[in-house]
Amino acid sequence: MQLGLTSEQSVAEAVKQISSAVARFNPQLDHSQFLIERQLASPITELIVSVRQDSQFGMALTLGSGGILAELLEDVVTLLLPASTAEIHAALKTLKIAALMDGYRGQTKVDLPALSSSLYNITQFMQHNPEKIMELEINPLFVYQQQICAVDALVYTNAET
C-alpha cells in the first residue's frame, strides 16, 4: 500500500514498484490489477461503532474512541437497544473524545445531532435484520463536521440465512 500519491506519475510509479515486489515474492500471483482509492482527509475524530447480539441482554450498541485510540484510551460506552437519537447523542457526550467533537481548541465542531442520527440509522438497520446480521463493527468511523465515512468494517452474518 502507498499513501500520499498526488499525481498520475506518482501513482504509475507506485504501481510499478508494487507489481515488481509482488512478482519477486511470488511470480505465480496476478500482479496486473490494482485498487486505487482517493485518500481521505484527516477526520475531526475516529470512532469505533459496534452493534451486536448479546445472548443475555439482546442487541447492544457500543461507541468509543476509534482507530489507534481504541485500545489506548479504553473509552467506550454501551447502550442496550432500542435507543433513541437523544440517548445516542448523550452517550457520545460521555466519551473522552467528546471535546474533540465539540471543537476543542477552536477546531471544527462535529454536527452531533447529525452524527447521532446516522448512528441511530445503523441501529435501526441492525434491529430490522437480526436474523441476517449477527454483528457489525466499524473501526475506524471517520467523523467530519457534516459527514462520516466507514473506513473499515467487519460484518458477521448468519450462515443459515
Predicted regions and their residues:
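ATP-dependent carboxylate/acyl-activation modules
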Residues: M1-T161
